Amino acid sequence: MPHKITVEVEGELTDDSWVVDFGALKEIARSICQELHHKFLLQRDSKVLQMDEGMSNWKVRFLERGWVFPKSEVLPLPIDNTTAERLAEYIGGRIGDALKDCGATNVSAITVGVEEMPGQTGWWRSR
């Protein structure tokens, strides 16, 4: 994923006087981004694409056009569009889940920005 992401967390300070350990947060974010990197991000919840998952490939159709992608190069995501905003929402949700799994129950908000190019960033904030 060649996009730049920004992650902000808010919450109560721990006994160590931080909201989260930045090292752990960076590792979580990097791991998620690595999963997305060099993959065709398929918007599984699209209202305009028709998709068929085969044994070795994905067939995607839009109106009269169609494409076939090897499964090894596709990452199906539970989003309706691969906009920066939806990718930020997906990444933010994954970060939130991972932080909870690490015991960071003090986090009250997560904000994620996905920058497609300088000055063009889509934002998502947890509620």
Regions found by a protein language model. Give the residues of each.
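Charge-rich, low-complexity N-terminal segments
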Residues: 1-127
